[in-house]
UniProtKB/Swiss-Prot annotation:
It comes from Bacillus subtilis (strain 168). PANTHER family: COA-BINDING DOMAIN-CONTAINING PROTEIN, CYTOPLASMIC PROTEIN-RELATED. This is Uncharacterized protein YneT. Pfam families: CoA_binding_2 (PF13380). InterPro entries: CoA-bd, NAD(P)-bd_dom_sf. It comes from the Bacteria. The gene is yneT. GO terms for cellular component: cytoplasm; cytosol.
Amino acid sequence: MQNPSKAEIKEILQRSKRIAVVGLSDRPDRTSHMVSKAMQDAGYEIIPVNPTIDEALGVKAVSSLKEIDGPIDIVNVFRRSEQLPGVAEEFLETDAPVFWAQQGLVNEEAYQMLKEKGRTVIMDLCIKVAHAVTK
């Protein structure tokens, strides 16, 4: 498994506008909330994807990626590593080009599934940190 280069990640972040966040919590003390808030503050549109909440960051939550209207640039995932193949399968039903699993999340099965379909895959990297170091 290999992530795109720092230059490629910078380009992905520069061209992207909408980030669907799978597993986004409505609790401000959760990492998913803090990272997504930072990305929202940086100008990205955040779409919460979590069937157990009504909204997060002032945005109505959807229960699955399939419920999102319009294009998705990045799907940022805050789920356990063993759940990544299931998220990847749902991701492949969208037109989103980039699957981004947060720091500490790696799953070789999901990685191979997505690469075989020509999608960009980033794993084990915090999107907030990547955004900060590639500005």
